[in-house]
Amino acid sequence: MRVLFYVFPFVIFALSQAQLISVHVIFRHGARAPVLNVTSEEAKSYFYRGLGQLTDVCIEQAKLIGKVLKDRYVNTFVDARMLPTQLLFRSSPVERCLMTIQTVGNTMFVNSTPPVQTVAKPDDFLLVPKLDCAFQIDEWTNFFNLTENDKKQAKKNPWFISEKALRRATAASQTLQQRSDENLPALILEKDAGLAVPSWFNEEAYKESLTVFYKALAVMSSVGEYKSSKGIRVKTGLLLDKILNDIQEKVRCHEKNQKGHISCDRHKLQVFSTHDLLILPFLDALGIREAALGEDLPPKFLSAIIIETMLLDDIPFVKVFYRGDPRDITLRDMTGLVRNCPPNQALCPVNLFTSCCGEFITADPRRECYEEKADQQLHNWTMTTVSWILIGISAFLLIILIIMSYLAVRYKNRSVVTIKKVCLEN
């Protein structure tokens, strides 16, 4: 106890002397309406923006995390005048993610809104979890013994598999066993919003529904009992790869910048707005999913992961924080729980942190996701090229053969004429 008494002030003092060089913030969008349906007219009126869209509560949630980030980083780390070169605000193209990050940015910088970058959904492998990868059908077949008809449905609509996982988890629940036909995801959101729900959906049923709902998310995000390293890699591997490379690049820049001749400020604060299906595998890759969320629980709205990189006596370290509740103004320090980081330590050396997640990193998730299609396209292209080459060679040889045949016939005819001429002269 006495050791802790002396060590703790030392850690606080050391951190106060540290130079922050980069920050990455990854959060789930704020509170939204159910995606598929609501269960009452009251709910329909409450979620007036439409299915899957943000609620008014989300706006307040986004403002709160914006204030948390402003108090922590604006003025002390980035310029309060909002210099776009210092920032990267990147969002999934889905409206709820875009609206969330825009509100966060508006709160952080009062006079100017940071530009938000995004790309079309089919091309976004950074923040949109891919669910239509060919290999996933094989994994799901192993989990659920899919029939050929099931496979066809899963290819058309991957959420068909999520429904299977939801029903399996519901059937295994003593509380919800008879409720497999109920719209549990909608009831969870409606209860959270303070709306009227059926009497059977009491606190016990609500808590059990969170676990059941997590199981439906787990199969789609490749974690928990449905864990797949390749599945995690195609969903969150590119974001991990980007963040780890960014951290290493910032460290190298500051090592070169001992005399202050170059600037290392570009994109030193990066903020990403995404989905629960990416937050889950991201936490799993870091090795902190259960520590952050609890056992078999989904991430809440506007839950956030914050990764700070700093120099302490010119030595680079990382700290990892998690914000689990949309009402939280404090951050939980998860640094000592991250894979490869020294346990129970306040700081993680950069070289250990950046080696945390090798099996979950990819620079080309498109290739891994659509591997068979890509190989098939490459195969088709190669075959077509070879075919044209063979046709060209054949045509060339045919022309040569025709020319040689013509010359042979001409030579033969000339020989015959010569012989006849000789015979006549004799």
Swiss-Prot record:
It catalyses: a phosphate monoester + H2O = an alcohol + phosphate. The keyword Disulfide bond applies. Glycans are attached at residues 37, 145, 380. This is Putative acid phosphatase 1. The gene is acp-1. Disulfide bonds join 133-369. It is a single-pass type I membrane protein. The active site is at 29 (nucleophile), 276 (proton donor). It comes from Caenorhabditis briggsae. Residues 1-18 form the signal peptide. SUPFAM superfamilies: Phosphoglycerate mutase-like. PANTHER family: ACID PHOSPHATASE-RELATED (PTHR11567), PROSTATIC ACID PHOSPHATASE (PTHR11567:SF211). Residues 410-426 are cytoplasmic. PROSITE patterns: HIS_ACID_PHOSPHAT_1 (PS00616). Keywords: Disulfide bond, Glycoprotein, Hydrolase, Membrane, Signal, Transmembrane, Transmembrane helix. Residues 19-388 are extracellular. Belongs to the histidine acid phosphatase family. Pfam families: His_Phos_2. InterPro entries: Acid_Pase_AS (IPR033379), His_Pase_clade-2 (IPR000560), His_PPase_superfam (IPR029033), Histidine_acid_phosphatase (IPR050645). One of its GO terms (molecular function) is phosphatase activity. GO terms for cellular component: membrane. Its EC number is 3.1.3.2.
